[in-house]
Amino acid sequence: MVNRVHLTWDGEHRFDAGRPGGVTHRIDASARTGPSPVDTLLNALAACTSVDVVDILAKRRTPVRSLEVDVEGARAAETPARLVGILLTFRIAGAGIERVHAERAIELAVTKYCSVRDSLDPNLPVRWALELEA
């Protein structure tokens, strides 16, 4: 399996990215007209883990009504200012979702199923928290 994406430079520090012939989104190093490259990476991690969380909970017959994720990426002070830690805070709502099951779904997503997480440095700490709403 191979994923293909295409990126076009607009002459500044902005790029339009997406699948060839598909929908594009703006990536902006200054984060003025779109997320920065690092923001895009953090969004990819949030989206990837969220897909898994929703699927895992659906298999338990406890469908998610809403899900939001706030992501904090701590960065090194020196160039290239790589990520040194990530915190994912999941806010999940759905009738009948038990805390233990939501926590297990997040743990499995972060440690086993998310291909974005698995593609990052295994020594990069990725922590998570859960806010569960009825």
Regions flagged by a language model, labelled:
Residues 1-44, 53-134:
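Extended beta-strand/beta-hairpin segments
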